[in-house]
Amino acid sequence: MGKIKKILRKGPPATKRPPKAARTESADSALGLDAHSDLEKPATSSDDGFEEPTPKPKPSKKTTTLPGPVSIIAQKKNKFRTDDAKNVKPPTLEEMKELRDTRNLFHSNLFKLQVKEMLEELQLKTKYTEYIDNWMESFTVFTQRLKDGLVEKSQLEVPLNVDKKISGFIFSKPTKEPQLIGAASTGTLLGPKIVVDVALEMPKDCLHKDDYLNLIYDQKRALYLTYVTNQMRSDPAYSQDKFAFNYHGNNPLKPVLELTPAAKQVSKHLQLRLFITAPQSTFKPSRFVPWNNNIRPTYYNDEWDEEEALPSTQHYNASVLFDLTLAQNQALLDKAFKGRRNFQDGLLLLKVWLRQRELDRGFTGFGSHILASFIVYLNQQRILHQSSSSYQVARTVWNQLANTDWTNGITLAPASGQTEQLSTMAGYYDVCFMDVSGQLNLCANVPLGVYQRVRAEAKLAVDLLNDMKLNSFPYIFMQKCPLYTRVDNILKITNYSSIQQMLVLHSKPQMKYDFASYGYPQLLQILTELLQKGLKQRVQAILPIETVSSAWPVESKAPIIGQAIQLGLILDPEHAYEVLDKGPSSNDDPEGSAEFRKFWGEKSNLRRFQDGSITEAVVWGTTKDAPSKKRLIVRQIVMHLLEHHLQLDSKDIQYIAAELDLVYQLSPWFKVSKVKTKLELQQDTDAEALSPNVIRCYDDLARQLHALDDLPLEIVSISSISPVSRYCEPMPVLPQARMMADHIHASHIQRVIIQLGQSGKWPNELSALRALKTAFLIEIGEKLKAQCRLNWSITSEGLLVLKRGFCFLLELAHNKELALLKQEVTERGVTKYVDNPESRALEQRHYILPKVSGALHSLHQSHSAYGPTVLIAKRWLATQLLDDGIWPPMATELLVAHLYQQRNAPQAIAAPQTGFIRFLHLLAHSDWNGELFLLNFNSSWQEQQIGDLEHSFRSDRQSYPPLALATSYDQQHAGRLWTTGESPSLRILSHVSRLARHALEMIETSLQSKDLRFVRPAQLFRGSSEGYDLVIQLKSDLVPNALSYDLGSPFVSFDQPNYLLPRAGKDPLAAIVHQLRSAYSDYAAFFYNPHGGKELAIMWRPPAVFAPKAFKVTELQACTLCDKGKVQVVRETLVEDFKVLLKDFYLRISTPEELKREQREHQNPKRYFNAKPQDNESCSKSKKRKLAKAAKVQAPLKRKSLIKSRPLKSLS
């Protein structure tokens, strides 16, 4: 089983997909039926759809196979030769069946091979089966040696918490041998932790006819388990094993013994669980029908009117019936599964699918035993047949789960035993699936929300299988989907007093008796009913998020569980953020209006609407509220309901929603009141809320450009390619751009691409064409000034236009410029057109990016959480010191778009925070080398094109960058356009994966803890200071702070921010870092936060780079002379070069350890607490004097004789 964990994490290795031509040319070769192929090895089952035909002996006559195309040509030449045709053997019946099954059942041979390999990895190793068999023999002998007698006090604690304990229990040794149950019996054990369930039946002599009442049976079962455990511990065969008690399925009435063997060969992955059961004939079956009561009110000292009927205890009755009917149900499963490898493998596929989604956990879990019973049910109904393959078993179960309704009840009982009681029994449960006895509901504890979620996941699996353009295997089986990543909001209540308050004041006596005073299901029912009534269409599902109970030592007292609850809310994006809840009309339905007013309390008010109706209504906000505020409406409703109906204080509740939206809010240090604009700006605004202002301004500018008179050429199209146009700019864009001294100053520029009409008068020389473009831009600027009164400025990149406080950079796009960039003349004078980095960059910016930008804008319109998810993701990457030169911003946008496009969840993401968590999962668990991220916008890619691209990617992986992204607009550059080999590099991808895994661990830890506080943004959005060799601190007054919320630095503390407006389009620090990387990337890696970061972290390359080497003229870059005529790259020399390049920005250099020590020792730490007085002169002095003085103070020391580095010389 050592490989099980590996296969669940990584999945099977990538298999090359043959081109379509090859698939149609020869079906046998496409399906891998070559006689020498490894696929010819017999599979483990003859009925699972995966066994290859047994190879037949070859004829004695030798034949020669020609390679590749030569073989095809030879076949065509010999098309009509009868002698060669005689050598072609017709396919056998087995081969025909194999071809038909592969064509009908699977997408491709790749999907079939992946499923087959996974099933082979999941098979139990022989050492485990042998150990289990030997253990069962030993345990059987042990039970026969047990002696009858009175159970006295022992060192062990009885693993059951009850109010009234019994005494005088007499132990009787088992009369029936222990038996394997569950997966161990059906042959479907699943790792990596193999749990073997063993049932030991308690004889009837231990029980009396009235023990079904008031938890007496449960106490005797726990005492029986305690006695057996005590005897096992004293037996030499088990004395070295580890013993612990636990609750089965988080049910405090179901204690089991967990035994971990001491044998080294199995102790790491094997665990045995001992269940105590009772004979089915112990009690009358009629005692446990759902409408009977088996826990009297007097047991809890409650008073009950004798004239009233006792409340039903259907859930407790089902708990006892589970033990009584276990043997009968297990016999049915054994009959269906033993010897049928296809059913066993099908159930294994379903168990992997269910476990990856965490829907089988806890008290309310949809266990795998339900799936096993459902397979038997489908076989009884003749929907599944004995010859169905394992794939058909899994697919049929998913299809039937998605299209059948269990709320009305289904049953395994024989037809003769089915009565009209099925519908009656279904009325006592949310979901009803009766067992073979017709008495036990296998889904007694499954709430309706969990069942509907299972159905939705099953429907998604079928849809993925039906999508012929997609390899659905990783989405169904490989991707781990924790439940907290599937929900949009989480409600968490862990305060003990609040839990007890809800149980005492709001739990009905019937619920207490029904669940034997177990608090968790009572809380779940109270909260679910209340929230469903209040939220209505705003939520699609309310799901319990359970943590599996932990085992405890057998000497310790049984813990009390169920004292906390977590609920996950899956929101409906169409209705979740509506600001109004409208009640019934007070005139037409006064009773309904009064009930509405009572339910909502003081929040409800009588209102008159535009249609003249007068109704009660609750208003949660205004239509003008920012999207981030609207996303908190559900939180506002839930908190009000809990306070109004359950009297809970807000301090005792944690509602997890939009905590991470803080990272793209406007910094409180920046005051919007100082911005001169006609726009209404709020101090608590954010980047998402400000984006529409920029988009509206751009639309107005586009109209003005189209309306310009007397232009030499007509403007055909205008496209914005800035991130803000697709709601992907994480920095708040404020209307603060200004014209100062004939220059435009702005913190952001919005890039606009203008396409002109066709003309044959453009010059054929590149520099002349660009000069003409500049002249055209100048004319546009002059006309904008004359006709629209807009200020403008020309730069080497394009035309800067100032409008309403926003700065736009206009660029002209013309096909001829792209052709001239590609043009090359060979030595023979032949002109050809070849792609090069410059031409690709121009084609991307002018022609592809406008289309992709429009597609991403449309994606945000259909999924409003897409934009804010990108904002959070970009901020997280930036705070990990990953700037645009290391990780392209478009890579983040496309990866998040891939999340929103792929159908790996039944519901769309409604909350940006959930989208970000899924983005972290994508970074943490992606196979960068084997995965090509395809974005098929508007489904414009055909299946053939997708197949060809995937084949090219797998067959020529080295020609693609480490992170391969492809959109349907990339044309021939698909997979190579948005990233490069160094941006991001494979090392950076590995680094980001580690960071993402660490962030997910922090999130999971905070969710699983009893602490009400969710992980703080400052914990997630602050990079680590570990691993860096040097930190260069920059002058804080020369590096403007970002307008977004400052989450701090991993190196130093906060200081007074500055918000200087730089020249439009200028980023001096980014330019310097680019120079450093161009010149010194072979010796050091450079990291900084592009969102206002004021430190430059340096990581040296491995020591081998700095070792002395022989003197060579061609290898003197950054070298210094050393002994014996050798040269060496000296780190100190490089540091001096860094200082020279940084010039005025450089403040000081130190190691991270020194900074930590200074922070600990400094009493009043600031962001730059060691700056010299000369560097902090009064702001009244001119900037030139200030920079000159700082440069003089920080002038580099004189160096010894060395060879000046060539990169530095060239840069100067």
Curated annotation (Swiss-Prot):
This is Nucleolar protein 6. One of its GO terms (cellular component) is UTP-C complex. Coiled coil: none annotated. The keyword Nucleus applies. It comes from the Eukaryota. Residues 1-72, 1156-1212 are annotated as: Disordered. GO terms for biological process: ribosomal small subunit biogenesis; rRNA processing; tRNA export from nucleus. Part of the small subunit (SSU) processome, first precursor of the small eukaryotic ribosomal subunit. During the assembly of the SSU processome in the nucleolus, many ribosome biogenesis factors, an RNA chaperone and ribosomal proteins associate with the nascent pre-rRNA and work in concert to generate RNA folding, modifications, rearrangements and cleavage as well as targeted degradation of pre-ribosomal RNA by the RNA exosome. Its main location: nucleus. Keywords: Chromosome, Nucleus, RNA-binding. Residues 1197-1212 have a biased composition (Basic residues).
